[in-house]
Amino acid sequence: ALSEDALRAGGYGAVYACGPMPMLSYVKRIAESAGIPCYISMESRMACGMGVCLGCTIHTSEGNKRCCKDGPVFDSRILEFPKPVSKPARKALDGVPDLSIAIGDVRLKNPVIASSGTFGFGTEYASVFDGGKLGGIASKGLTLEAREGNTGIRLWETPSGLMNSIGLQNPGIAHFIDFELPEMLKLKTVTIANLSGSTLETYVEGAKLLDKTAVPIIELNISCPNVAAGGAAWGMTCANAETAVREVRAVTKKPLIVKLTPQAPDFTGVALACIRSGADALSIGNSFQGVAVDIERGVPVFDKIKAGFGGPAVRPIAVRLVWETFEAMRSLPPHERVPIVAVGGIEKWEDAVEFIMAGALAVGVGTNTFANP
């Protein structure tokens, strides 16, 4: 291993180093201690390479320096390295770890859930994927009445995600209870019924029907338009969100996940309002709204103009919403805090871990299911 004594014995006139930050910090220290000039090649993330973005700026004793224009090689004497931080020791595992989580009084065997609208009723993917490996499967969005959904183009790919305008096409809650739910309950995972509605009455009546079934968990989607409020989503204001959750909570004792809309101006306020009204968990990171224009025809791509947008591009925003909501819940007594199910751009296990570190208990995978079931 390189040491101060080895540098002295080698008779070097100078030392040049490049590599990971902890190594460079060490080389700087021993070279300067040995009295040997040291020059270090610094690497930093950059966007332009022209000295414009300032993303590659490093802090030195002579002020800020740009790696791309002022470097990348610097005299080690002006460089300032952060103190090394040791990674926490890994705990040895004794057998298979317990990944189970609880939402209300229902236990899921692991924290991975197939998001509503992307996994059908759990049986459609049976030929390519065993849904029983999941912690839970959320059904398609269900409404009191059957819906045919939106006309026109329904899907539109972007360089970093997928836009959708399905329009909650579904067979209705009664059909779901009679034909789809029995098959979902046969899967070796937890079934979650996603409840959508356009009026308070349809939410309540739908919840009453689902409460009489064996479905373990209800997910209340308050991203749906509120007809009485001119079409604005129920979750856009604290008052409307609180009303919807309170009224549904009054007619069911099943664990209730509330799926929030990321468009809410006071997102954490809405989240706390839902908790006060009886939510057992919050689903954070539902589709963001976007607009696409067909430049060949000069008209919007979707008949409804606006469409949901999901995929890798939304993940940093969804992580922020999870982080802020988790921080906001610190104002509540521990027994009043609820689990967060994080949704938004999850492609791999590292993405899930990022959400969990930000404050989530579970994660929902949606758009990526279409790319790689």
Listing of model-derived features with the role each one plays in the protein:
Residues 68, 87-96, 309-337, 347-373:
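Alpha/beta catalytic cores of nucleotide-metabolism and tRNA/nucleoside-modifying enzymes
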Residues 1-92:
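Reductase modules of NAD(P)H-dependent flavoproteins
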Residues 119, 194-197, 260-266, 335-350:
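Glycine-rich beta-to-alpha transition loops that act as phosphate-gripper elements at the mouths
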Residues 20, 138-144, 222-224, 281-292, ...:
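Glycine-rich phosphate-binding active-site loops on the catalytic face of alpha/beta enzymes
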